[in-house]
Amino acid sequence: MSWLRNSSHRESAPVSVRLSIIPLLFLLASMASIGCGGNSGGFSEPTFDERTEMPKAADDSNALRFGAASMENPIELSESYYPLLKELSEKLGRPVRFVPLKNNDELMQAIVRGQVDLARLGPLVYLNLRDRTDLEVLVRPVKKDGTGSYAVIAVRNDTPMKTLQQLRGKSIALGDPKSTYSNIMPRKMLRDAGVSMGDLSSVGMLGSMDNCAQNVLNGAYVAGAMSDSIYEKFRTRAIGLRILARSEDLPGEPIVARSALGAATIDQVRRALLSVRDPEVLNAISPGQEAYVPAAPGDYDRFRAFE
C-alpha cells in the first residue's frame, strides 16, 4: 500500500487494484463515521476526484441513507451497492449513505425508526412495512424480456433428481424467514408439490441466499432456495447449479422511500433511479437486470396470499 502513502512515487498501482480498493474505502469511511458519532450502521458515500478515483470527505448533513438487508460479508455487500449509490449521489447532487443491516427484521426497525430513508425490500417485507409506516414505492427491477424475479429451488448439476417430490427424505437450505424468494415462496412451491417440511430430512435456516447457494455447491444440503438472480450468480461456480423448480414470474424487489422525505425529494430519487441504464451498475445488485421501471403499491398485493 506504499503507493497510497507516498504521493511522490510515480509508479501507479495496477488498475484492478486501484478499482477494487474503492469499495473497501467506502466501507472504512462508514466505520470512521460511526466512530465519530455518525448515524450507526452506514457506509458513507464519498464524492470523487475524477483524476484519482479516490474518495474525498463528504458532508453528511444532507445525506440520504439507503438500507438493504443481507448476511453477506460487508465488503462484498458494499461492492454490490457501491456503483448504484455513486451514480445516485452524482444525479441527486447529495451524498447517499449505505446502511447495511444483518436481516429483514433489523431493516424494518431502521425504517420505522427513521434511521433509513431509502431501501431495497423483499415484496412481503414491503407489505409488512406498508401496514406499519408511511412508505412510497418508487421502482422495481425488470429483465430485458420485461419479467421481474423468480423464486428458485436449485440443486447441484450432479444431482439426479428431476422433481420436487424427489426431495422427500433430502435436505434443503432456506434463507431469512421473511424472505419472499428464499423462504416463503419456496415453502409454497413445496406445499403445492405435496411436500411438507416434515417430509424433508433437514431444513437449514441459513439467513442469506448466498449461503443457501454456497451450501448446495459444497454438498451440505441437497437443495437450496434463492432468487433467480442469486442462482445466476452461482450457477457456473464449482460443479454448478441447476434449477429443480421455479415460481411464477413475480415483481422484483422494490426500492422504497419514507414518505417523510417529501414529494419533491421522492420524485427526484424516482427519476434518478429510472434513468440508470449502465448494465454494470444494474447487474452489480441483481444479475440479469435491464432497468428500473415505475412501481405501484398494487404490484405487490398478490403477495398477501403467500403470507
Residue ranges and their predicted role:
Residues S2-R5, H9-V17, F26-E106, V112, ...:
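N-terminal hydrophobic or amphipathic helices and topogenic motifs
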Residues R65, A69-S70, K144-V155, T236-P279, ...:
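Periplasmic-binding protein-like
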Residues R65-S70, Y81, P100-N104, G114-R132, ...:
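Beta->alpha turn/N-cap motifs
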Residues F66-S89, L101, L124, T147-Q214, ...:
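Bilobed "Venus flytrap"/periplasmic-binding protein-like clamshell domains
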Residues M71, L121-V125, K143, R156-T159, ...:
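Solvent-exposed coil/turn segments that connect beta secondary-structure elements
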Residues S80-L84, N103, L107, G122-V125, ...:
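Stable alpha-helical elements in mature extracytoplasmic
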Residues D105-A119, R132-T133, Q165, M209-A225:
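Short helices/loops that flank or line small-molecule/ion binding pockets
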Residues P123-R132, M189-D192, Q214-L241:
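A ligand-binding cleft/hinge motif common to bilobed small-molecule-binding domains
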